[in-house]
Amino acid sequence: MYRAPSAHDAHPGGVVSAVKYRGLELDVCRRRSTWRALMASSILAVVLVFNAATAGPPLWQQRAEQRDGLSAAEFSRLVRDLSEEGGYFRSDNFTSNETSYLHIVSKLREVGTTGGAYIGVGPEQNFTYIAKVRPRIAFLIDIRRQAIIQHLMYKAIFHLASSRWEYLSLLLSRPLPKDKALSADASVIDILSFFSKALADDRAYASNLAAIRKAIKEDFQIQLSDTDQSSLDYVYKSFRDEGLDIAYRMEGSRGGWFPSLKELIEQTDQYGKLGNFLATKDDYEFVRDLHRKNLVIPVVGDFAGKKALAAIGDYLRKGGFTVAAFYTSNVEQYLFQNGVFPSFAENVRKLPITEKSLFIRAVPNTRFTHPAQLPGHRITTLLQQLNVFLKDFDEGRYQTYTDLVMTHYIAPASPQ
């Protein structure tokens, strides 16, 4: 926690009386000057260390790179320098568990939330929001180091896969037929039908994993520790073993139902329209292009931590970006439980925003039913303006998570 200086922090010799003998007085002044110089040097050193994470190339070079993409060296630096120490969460987020994730897409379009910067948390649902918001740059922040390794795996697959067919083939270790032409414009339902029947192949798995490791090490210039390698093996093997049936896992869930990857891809908005990033060639290619430009940057960080989110905000501000959308899932629920929500709000305050900057929240309908819940969904996805959030926070409106999700939210459009 930051603490404002108080009177007790003042130097006990802050006011020094004049000394009778000029020589002694001069010595005191010299000592005070030396002490001040040392203090100034110490403060400067602290500032330099704090700014090191976002210093990078000069501003003009950063903006040029952001148009054309970041170099591998700069991508690697950002992943490394913006990240905090990893933390623990009791789930394997192989996939999202939010079937309502498309319900706010029409509202995003209506508000005009597009371009700028996207910030998100969690696995593949971010790719759909990126496809809809069309940001110039994206940061994916997660407290679990394994989640960042999973995103590096995704990034490698995007680099290697020129089509949606190839993406799912690499992700699931299901080889594509060599004697059959596959249409780049095929419906996602047809693509899913093929992979629902395809069998995993151990040779493809080994070859693909080697290619993914090589891309992470050589193309992205990320050095994986032994623990990171084990995490990559675990995640990629899980996709091989479970295929399109893979789903979110939580310790102690007692076999509770979570949607499979296939079911998530098949989800529609409230008007019956498919919208996953794999639903159209155009959306897939946008997300792939952003990855290939090294502009989807995974960062290990705590929303309420002292470094990652604030450093992302500093980087965006220096680069001339404003936040278009910040997808928080239901992380804020845990921030309230852990008593650190105010620290998160202060981190949000450090982000460059406009009146169009929006939160995307996923609210579980477990302890109460949200008024905006749509039939057939256990999650309600909502929007909120970031500037409204900060105003409400300053007015003390958010004493509980329920207060947060029930105050000044933007509900999904009604299907009627």
Please report, for each region that a protein language model flagged, where it lies by residue.
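Alpha-helical subdomain
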Residues: G243-Q416
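Conserved class I S-adenosyl-L-methionine
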Residues: T113-E124
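Conserved SAM-binding loop of SAM-dependent methyltransferases across substrates and taxa
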Residues: Q125-V133
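Bacterial N-terminal signal peptides
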Residues: M39-A52
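Signal peptide processing junction and immediate N-terminal pro/mature segment
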Residues: V49-A64
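Mature N-terminal segment immediately following signal peptide/propeptide cleavage
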Residues: R67-E110, A117
